Amino acid sequence: MVKMMEKKNYCKEIQDYIDYASNNPNKISEDIKLCIENIVKPTLSRDDIIFDEKVFQDCIKFCEKWFYPLFPYQKFIYAFFFMYEKETPSLVIFSEILILMGRGNGKDGMLMPLCCFLLTHYYGIKNYNIDIVATSEEQAINTFNVVYNMLDENKTVMKKYFEWNKTEIRNKKTNSKLRYNTSNAKTKDGKQTGMILFNEYHAYEDYKQINVYSSGLGKIEHARTVIITTNGTVREGPLDEKISISESVLRGEDNFLNLLPFLYRLKKREDVDKAFAKFLETKDKKDINLDILCQANPSLEYREVLKNEIIKDYLKMQQQKSYRTEFYAKRVNLPEQDEDEVAIEWNKILKASFKNVEEKIPRDFNVKDGEDAIVGIDFADLNDFASVGLLFKIENEIIWRHHTWICCKSRFYKDIKFPFANIGLDGFNDFEVVNTESINARDIVLYVLKYIGKYNIKKIVLDSYRYKLLEQTFKEFNVSVETRDNPNGLIRMVRYPASIAAIVAPQLEVEFSNGNINIGDSALMRWSINNTGVKTGRDGNKAYYKIEPKLRKNDPFMAFVVAMSVINLLVKEVIYV
């Protein structure tokens, strides 16, 4: 039972951190500032919540006695675990808590003392089972061992209250258990769980495992999900989606999911360089000012080891370019891709989708009926993926909108790393999943034909192999092929597809960099571009390739590429009189 304190809207530890943030703005990320203004302060002013200050203080004492002193920001975060609905105290105010911070900040060390406390009679919920979920066994065990090692080191006292082995810790009074789980999610459905702790959420490429564990919530009071993670290199996965939702909540939009996001991260690459700018001139480590890196690393000013590691990694990055992706993603939560591999950098892909990236405001589709257009078509096999797109050029803006068919009978479908289950949601409206042995070639052709009357289609571009599979249907509708004898034929077959990238890749690099590409809010298109690598041959020509051949598809992007090969047909001739 929750025992109420008279001061339900005040917590010293929360106020201390708010004051710290106010006095040290350079050390606080913009996201944390928004969290304080748009979530924390409004929550503290509500009269429909209970803040159980006594149990919270008991938690702090327990954790600091049996584990180690907590940093101020950790106490600040802990406090929100002890807020409940006034009318229904079995429900927590924040049923989902996301904590994003850089590597080395002690994520496990922060949350595991709290998890241990939640097992005890001080918290008072019987059978409050906590499941640690990680994609690797090593990660799951390391997290679990924070509590296991404490119990083992204090076994004389702790054996009165706990029993434990290498896979499970049980509190004798409450029967609450701490367990760890790995990627074999098939056997975990139906667990009665009070809290799920997802560790290193960035490693998940889809929701298959996540959904299995989440289904165990709702049977025990105070049900909650906690995500603690650095950023990573997986794009358009669950973490990107969670961060996007968090950004909306932080801006003050409706918080239907009762989500509390603590996003410790940097927003700009140049902020990292600011910390080291003077040092790079003087070579004197005293000239390194890491204050701004505290935005992604809240433990930085308390842990000298972390400071030294960040400095070492930054210097390593200066000498080893390939380390840039790892440093920016893991140390400051600023995703960056290996520039020697990806065709287009992620931040440029986002700018192609959104006119305001932070607020996720999609780019407009200002194309009138009758506008000149190019059709691009690409697919590997009709029993897999197939994409068709329309390319427009309005002044300097290159606009691309696609439609993609996905065959769910493909032997690779279940393992493809894209959240098809989101179909119909914003950003997931330009594809369809077909439940047939293969994609119907007629559907592809009919899709093209319906736009021939709407727009002035200058060319339909695809390579000769793809054309052979669509030829019969195109002929049925009298769509002719461009030849030497028929230069006005609508279909242009590309004889040597590999040669296209040599022409298109340099142009796309410039157009993406200049912000001239408009793909709209298309998660599948962003994913497709991000799945495409580019290599420079000995002759200096560039060639595109799939970064992962079977499971990371790039058909929508390659349809765009073939259409771009004839974009000159969209250049309007200006006649001066």
Model-derived features: where do they sit?
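Phosphate/NTP-binding elements of NTP-utilizing enzymes
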Residues: 2-377, 531
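Extracytoplasmic
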Residues: 508-517
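Active-site phosphate-binding and catalytic loops of NTP-dependent enzymes
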Residues: 154-158, 515, 571, 575
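RNase H-like, metal-dependent nuclease domains and their acidic two-metal-ion catalytic environment used
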Residues: 112, 141, 149-150, 170-174, ...
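Short polybasic/polar patches that bind polyanions
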Residues: 64, 475, 513
